[in-house]
């Protein structure tokens, strides 16, 4: 179908043509003539890289230009939100303003009312629904990217609640990978179903086993090892993406592959890769990444910092990085296709031991093979060490993806959502709550209504017993202040209960380690894991620091206790300005883990302060908690807090300023620019920015530092 045949405004067609799109892919054409442009709900279940996003973009632009209002585009990851935000900016030329909303769950974000297209994570949009943001009534379209995540143990229930809230209020488009039961999902959504196996790049699939690749079509090719598949791709001037099941394995495999990949690079590439490697901040994980980068190889996992992940993704897309070894996090929607995808592991560790990776996930990884506009064919190869190729082909290549099942039985999320129905949406009777849940995917799948009823009763009793709600003499359910604040803070009521129960102990003995340990035991924070080798260190630390903790060692839940304790130790080191590299080495963690727990800890400590206010804790405790939140946010000791206001000043520069005698904003305002320039890490641009912030305009010509080549040439 030609773009000119689309039943949309000429302005939309013009944007598409400027992108070089003259003709739509068959699934796109089918979707856009299904009734979606006339307002019908739509579920698109097609392979990766088949143009799902463009279907949504055209439908959104058409809807908003014709009817006005707003569209919300839900994504599973912040990184994906940033990617979509960049893609959607094209539509601003038609007057459709685009915004992105991810963090800060305790805000109405009324500023979003000025925008037409809002890209948000599921959790962020759920929190906006709870806050009753006024602009939500103007939402005419809701797009759920990666809607198959409704079957995810962790996040599926949140997605299900959002959709249930919006069904009937807005047009809904679901974008999905190929799933096992799309008809059932489409029926629940009251949506037209577009299902297709069509791909813009042909995909050749096979299994590597005992020195041969056995292709799905019956052919075979000889390779000495699976690594030869990587080297062969690089020799052909193409890229390879290798999926493994563990972070450590990703790092080790990348460094092994790097030894040989380097031989296939030219001088220009080696020079650019050296510049990339030198741009990384120093820490043990980045040292390994830099070593691999020098040879055109990288690893990618959740333990990398955000900047490092973006650097790897961008340079792999550009073709400078030839090989990426990744954990499956990279298959979760980020746009990083490669000519050849090699799936090294089809088993992974879970809390229940080793488990087979689902067909849906493996097929998503395989879908990363083949780059539109660059490759005529992509190759996806599963490595098997023990299983016969025919069995792997039957299970993963020819097998159907698993069916999606509602995760509403996840009691933690159900607890939070039932409180939200009462405290935010005004549900005041058991029957109203039950009727709402009857509209969910859970109920649509015919799950046991008696079991659901029992869960609702148990949760309401928990909320009543812990003073989140009350039941009036007329049998009406009413929210209490603790319940209202808990749901607005977007925390699990169980977390709020832990805060409430622990506050008297905090009043008596306020200290960071105790608070960090408490929040790490709460369900809203996933604590760090620890190895057997670390057990004796953690036990020794515990016995020397136990007087600071609010919880005693519970031998029945020893592992949970020590995971929380290790997390508390890392946070304690962070606020005492221990360098990031030292934290990584001392506690056997990755930079990405530090950023994750710091971000979550800041939110939970803020929530603790808010719960303390509701429960009328002493002002001293509220102030103490708020100060601790700032220390966690910036990774600093208390005396540096005033300096963190300054632009371009992080924990290192703030400490350098303080140690040089500039302990507050007034002392900096009265300083000479030359005095600040003498401080390590403070350059002309930073000094200009600081003085501008303090209301003083200065212009500095930066002189070269002593001991540099520039100083030698221009003293």
Swiss-Prot record:
Q: What is its EC number?
A: 5.6.2.4
- Extract one GO molecular function annotation from the record: 3'-5' DNA helicase activity
Its GO biological process terms?
DNA repair
Protein's UniProt keywords contain Cell membrane = no
Span of domain Helicase ATP-binding: 33-197
Coiled coil segments of this chain: none
Motif DEAH box extends across 145-148
Motif (Q motif) spans which residues?
1-29
Q: Which Pfam families match?
A: DEAD (PF00270), Helicase_C (PF00271), Helicase_dom4_arc (PF21280), HHH_5 (PF14520)
Question: Which reaction is catalysed here?
Answer: Couples ATP hydrolysis with the unwinding of duplex DNA by translocating in the 3'-5' direction; ATP + H2O = ADP + phosphate + H(+)
Lineage: superkingdom: Archaea
Indicate the segments forming the Helicase C-terminal domain, all copies: 226-422
Q: Which PROSITE patterns match?
A: HELICASE_ATP_BIND_1 (PS51192), HELICASE_CTER (PS51194), Q_MOTIF (PS51195)
Q: Which residues bind ATP?
A: 28, 46-53
For this UniProt record, give its keywords in alphabetical order, as a comma-separated list.
ATP-binding, DNA damage, DNA repair, DNA-binding, Helicase, Hydrolase, Isomerase, Nucleotide-binding, RNA-binding
SMART domains reported in the protein's UniProt record: DEXDc, HELICc, HhH1
Q: Which HAMAP family match?
A: Helicase_Hel308 (MF_00442)
Q: What does this protein do?
A: DNA-dependent ATPase and 3'-5' DNA helicase that may be involved in repair of stalled replication forks. Rapidly unwinds double-stranded (ds)DNA with a 3'-overhang, has no strand reannealing capabilities. Binds single-stranded (ss)DNA, dsDNA with a 3'-overhang and ssRNA.
Q: Which family does it belong to?
A: Belongs to the helicase family. Hel308 subfamily.
Q: Do you know which NCBIfam families this protein is assigned to?
A: PRK00254.1 (NF001308)
| UniProt subunit comment | Monomer.
Q: What is this protein called?
A: ATP-dependent DNA helicase Hel308
């Amino acid at each position: 179908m030609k773009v000119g045949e689309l039943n949309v405004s000429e302005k939309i067609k013009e944007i598409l043509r400027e992108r070089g799109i003259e003709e739509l892919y068959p699934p796109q054409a089918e979707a856009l003539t299904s009734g979606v442009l006339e307002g019908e709900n739509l579920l698109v279940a097609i392979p990766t890289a088949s143009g799902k996003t463009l279907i949504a973009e055209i439908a959104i632009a058409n809807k908003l230009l014709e009817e006005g209002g707003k569209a919300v585009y839900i994504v599973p990851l912040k990184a994906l939100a940033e990617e979509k935000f960049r893609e959607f900016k094209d539509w601003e030329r038609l007057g459709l303003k685009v915004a992105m909303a991810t963090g800060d769950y305790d805000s109405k974000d009324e500023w979003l009312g000025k925008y037409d297209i809002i890209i948000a994570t599921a959790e962020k949009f759920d929190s906006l629904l709870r806050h009753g943001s006024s602009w939500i009534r103007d939402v005419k379209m809701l797009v759920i990217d990666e809607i198959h995540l409704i079957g995810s143990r962790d996040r599926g229930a949140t997605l299900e609640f959002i959709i249930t809230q919006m069904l009937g209020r807005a047009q809904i488009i679901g974008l999905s990978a190929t799933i096992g039961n799309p008809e059932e999902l489409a029926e629940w959504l009251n949506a037209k179903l577009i299902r297709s196996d069509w791909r813009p790049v042909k995909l050749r699939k096979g299994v590597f086993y005992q020195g041969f690749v056995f292709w799905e079509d019956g052919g075979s090719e000889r390779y000495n090892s699976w690594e030869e598949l990587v080297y062969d791709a690089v020799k052909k001037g193409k890229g390879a993406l290798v999926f493994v099941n563990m972070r450590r394995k990703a790092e080790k495999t990348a460094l092994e592959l790097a030894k040989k990949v380097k031989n296939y690079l030219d001088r220009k590439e080696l020079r650019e890769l050296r510049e990339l490697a030198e741009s990384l901040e120093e820490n043990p994980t980045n040292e390994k990444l830099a070593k691999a980068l020098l040879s055109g190889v990288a690893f990618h996992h959740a333990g990398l910092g955000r900047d490092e992940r973006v650097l790897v993704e961008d340079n792999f897309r550009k073709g400078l990085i030839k090989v990426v070894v990744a954990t499956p996090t990279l298959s979760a929607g980020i746009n990083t296709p490669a000519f050849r995808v090699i799936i090294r592991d089809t088993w992974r560790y879970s809390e229940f031991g080793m488990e087979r990776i689902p067909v849906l996930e493996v097929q998503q990884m395989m879908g990363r093979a083949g780059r539109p506009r660059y490759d005529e064919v992509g190759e996806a190869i599963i490595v098997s060490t023990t299983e016969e190729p025919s069995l792997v082909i039957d299970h993963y290549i020819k097998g159907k993806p698993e069916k999606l099942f509602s995760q509403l039985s996840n009691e933690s999320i159900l607890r939070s959502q039932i409180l939200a129905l009462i405290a935010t949406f005004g549900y005041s009777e058991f029957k109203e709550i039950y009727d709402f849940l009857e509209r969910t995917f859970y109920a649509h799948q015919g799950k046991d209504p008696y079991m659901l009823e029992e869960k609702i009763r148990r949760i309401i009793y928990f909320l009543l017993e812990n003073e989140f709600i009350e039941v009036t003499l007329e049998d009406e359910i009413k929210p209490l202040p603790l319940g209202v604040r808990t749901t607005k803070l977007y925390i699990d009521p169980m977390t709020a209960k832990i805060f409430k129960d622990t506050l008297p102990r905090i009043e008596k003995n306020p200290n960071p380690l105790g608070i960090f340990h408490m929040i790490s035991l709460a369900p809203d924070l996933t604590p760090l894991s620890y190895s057997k080798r670390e057990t004796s260190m953690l036990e020794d630390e515990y016995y020397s620091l136990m007087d600071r903790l609010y919880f005693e060692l519970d031998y029945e839940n020893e592992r949970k206790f020590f995971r929380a304790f290790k997390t508390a130790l890392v946070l304690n080191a962070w606020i005492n300005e221990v360098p990031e590299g030292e934290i990584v080495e001392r506690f056997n963690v990755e930079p990405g883990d530090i950023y994750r727990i710091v971000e979550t800890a800041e939110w939970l400590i803020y929530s603790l302060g808010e719960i303390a206010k509701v429960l009328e804790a002493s002002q001293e405790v509220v102030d103490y908690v708020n100060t601790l939140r700032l220390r966690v946010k910036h990774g600093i000791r208390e005396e540096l807090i005033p300096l963190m206001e300054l632009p371009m000043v992080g924990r290192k520069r703030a400490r350098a300023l303080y140690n040089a005698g500039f302990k507050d904003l007034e002392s900096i305002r009265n300083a000479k620019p030359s005095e600040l320039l003498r401080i390590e890490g403070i350059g002309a641009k930073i000094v200009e920015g600081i003085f501008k912030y303090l209301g003083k305009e200065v212009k500095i010509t930066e002189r070269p530092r002593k001991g540099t080549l520039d100083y030698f040439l221009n003293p």
